Design a protein with these regions (language model features):
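N-terminal secretory signal peptides
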Residues: 1-33
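Compact, glycine-rich, soluble single-domain proteins
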Residues: 28-50
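Solvent-exposed coil/turn segments that connect beta secondary-structure elements
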Residues: 6-8, 19, 62, 70-72, ...
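Short, charge-rich binding segments
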Residues: 58-59, 91
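A residue-level signal for beta-strand positions that form part of recognition/binding surfaces
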Residues: 21, 64, 97-99
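Well-ordered alpha/beta subsegment
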Residues: 81-105
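Loop/turn positions that initiate beta-strands
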Residues: 53-55
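Beta-strand-rich cores of mature extracytoplasmic or soluble domains
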Residues: 60-84
Length: 105
């Protein structure tokens, strides 16, 4: 699975931490989430998006990364940091938790 990252400070912070192995927890049967430690930098980053399947976001109030596998409504608390390319999101569209490794190509 590949992803195209946004051109913002939060996405750059995420990429700077790669490789990164995490457990993605299913949340609301809509997204997979994890909590980076420390939280990703969101200072000066534009907030607000209506996530589509494949969007990689940060939920600002909690600091978690959320990868949406279903469409969701507009939220001013979401920050878009990237999108999974093509139909790669299908691999995450399963119930339960998954352990994944994020790497640079």
């Amino acid at each position: 699975i590949t992803a195209t990252m946004a051109n913002n400070a939060a996405a750059q912070d995420f990429v700077s931490r790669l490789p990164l192995e995490v457990t993605l927890n299913d949340y609301n049967n809509t997204e997979k989430i994890f909590y980076p430690s420390p939280k990703l930098s969101i200072e000066g980053v534009k907030r607000g998006c209506a996530p589509a399947p494949g969007d990689i976001t940060i939920y600002a109030p909690w600091g978690n990364v959320a990868i949406f596998y279903k469409k969701w409504s507009q939220s001013s608390d979401l920050i878009l940091i990237g999108s999974i390319d093509g139909d790669g999101i299908k691999a995450l569209s399963v119930s339960g938790d998954l352990t994944v490794k994020f790497e640079r190509e």
